[in-house]
Curated annotation (Swiss-Prot):
Major location category of this protein: membrane
InterPro entries reported in the protein's UniProt record: K_chnl_dom (IPR013099)
Keywords assigned by UniProt, alphabetized: Glycoprotein, Ion channel, Ion transport, Membrane, Transmembrane, Transmembrane helix, Transport, Viral ion channel
Entry keyword Cytoplasm: no
Superkingdom of the organism of origin: Viruses
SUPFAM superfamilies per UniProt: Voltage-gated potassium channels
Glycosylation sites: N38
Subcellular location: Membrane
Keyword match Membrane: yes
Function description: Potassium-selective channel essential in the virus replication cycle. May be involved in preventing multiple infections (Potential).
Organism listed in the record: Paramecium bursaria Chlorella virus 1 (PBCV-1)
Biological process per Gene Ontology, one example term: potassium ion transport
Entry protein name: Potassium channel protein kcv
Family under the similarity heading: Belongs to the two pore domain potassium channel (TC 1.A.1.12) family.
Length: 94
C-alpha cells in the first residue's frame, strides 16, 4: 500500500498539469469565432486543426513559446494570459 501511495503522490502533479493543458486546449479549439480568427498561424492558408491547438497549448504550458502561433484578438490574449498565470501558480504550489 505504501508503494501505491508514493506512486500516487508522484503522478498527481503530472495529472494536474495534464488536466489544465487539456482544459485550455479545449478552450482554444472552441473559442468563440474559431481558432483561425483568434490566433494567427504561420501558414494562414492552412485551416487550423486539433494538432495546432494542442501544439499552441503545449508550447504555452511549457513556457517555450516559439512564436509561430500568436493570439490576435483581445479575448485570445486574455485566455493565453490566464493559461500562463494558471501554470505559474500550479508550479509554485506543487
Amino acid at each position: 500500500m505504501l508503494v501505491f501511495s508514493k506512486f500516487l503522490t508522484r503522478t498527481e502533479p503530472f495529472m494536474i498539469h495534464l488536466f489544465i493543458l487539456a482544459m485550455f486546449v479545449m478552450i482554444y479549439k472552441f473559442f468563440p469565432g474559431g481558432f483561425e480568427n483568434n490566433f494567427s498561424v504561420a501558414n494562414p492558408d492552412k485551416k487550423a486543426s486539433w494538432i495546432d491547438c494542442i501544439y499552441f497549448g503545449v508550447t504555452t504550458h511549457s513556457t517555450v513559446g516559439f512564436g509561430d502561433i500568436l493570439p490576435k484578438t483581445t479575448g485570445a490574449k486574455l485566455c493565453t494570459i490566464a493559461h500562463i498565470v494558471t501554470v505559474f501558480f500550479i508550479v509554485l504550489t506543487l
